[in-house]
Amino acid sequence: MKILVDAMGGDNAPLCVLQGASQAAAEFGDGMTLTLLGEEKAIRDCAKENKIDLAPFEIVNCTENIDMHDDPVKAVRHKKDSSLVKGLTMLKNGEADAFVSAGSTGALHVGTSLIVRTVKGVKRPALATPMPGAKQNFLLLDCGANVECRPEMLNAFGTMGSVYAEKVMGRTAPKVALVNNGAEDTKGTPTYREAHQLLKANPCIHFAGNIEPRYIMDGEADVVVCDGFVGNVVLKLTEGVAKTLLGMLKKIFLQNIITKLSYLGIKGGLGELKRMMDSEEVGGAPLLGAAKPVIKAHGSSHAKGIKNAIRQAKLCVANDLCGTMEKALGEVAAQKEEADA
């Protein structure tokens, strides 16, 4: 199994990418080859300065780089020798089994759609992120790939998310909910009102209706659908609230000797809460619907986030996620045809 890693993508590249890749190679590298893509001199200089052993890796030199300010479409079309575009091209050509990048979400989405393509039945891949819930974790999509969506796309996300929840997460009859500013059918923008009706009429999913943002984290729904703008806001707001809340609790427990002693009694529980809310534990979000595994790591990922994104890529390949998705979507399409007949 060969996994490509974009060494130049993300706010903390290449150092944190190299550190994360090194940890991945050490912890679960058996049967896996990691290939780093990026400016070879920068990679080697960084590794030397930080005493990182590059022996476990192959390095593919790239002379260009796509940054967060580049126009995604122009960057993918014109920066052919960037680590992101070269990685996706190698993946398409069968030179690797998966690609991991913490780089530009827009460029990765455009590049995946234009280069790697999508499985049959999917027009636009969506970023799907497992999120922690009070009762159980749930899948949130889209988390940033498609900022503007037509109602039909939101309906397709519901189908894709339902398939993923059933086939990968092991959920039986997964509940699908649509993020909205109210539970009533008439709430939301025209796009969301129409999407609600499409999801409600979709014979291939179990639609639970609209869900208000304050109830998302309850974990009642297995799949939560929204456009990429809303999903990215939900994702980053959740991360920010968790970080702030944990910081506030820490200040409270450090006030005096009594609060410090109280902290010792619940230290384990707080540690588990912190782990649950840590985005780096998940590592990255698969571009659901891509023809081959493409994992988007958080742009601010540190070593642990990169390591876990690589772990997720390995699991996707081992479990044939893309093949399973295509097969399941074929079954869904057949069910729809039967229902329409």
Map each language-model feature to its residues.
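Short beta-strand segments
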Residues: D6, L37-G38, V60, S101-G103, ...
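Phosphate/nucleotide-donor binding subsite
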Residues: K51-A96
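Short, glycine-rich nucleotide/cofactor-binding loops
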Residues: V5-L15, A145-N155, K296-H302
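Glycine-rich phosphate/nucleotide-binding loop
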Residues: S113-A126, P130-L140, E220-V224, G228-E338
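Short glycine/serine/threonine-rich phosphate/pyrophosphate-binding segments
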Residues: A13-V17, I43, D81-G94, A98-T112, ...
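N-terminal charge/polar-biased segments
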Residues: M1-V5, D11-L15, G29-G31, R44-D45, ...
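Glycine-rich phosphate/diphosphate-binding loop of Rossmann-like nucleotide-binding domains
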Residues: L15-C16, F28-T35, K41-R44, N50, ...
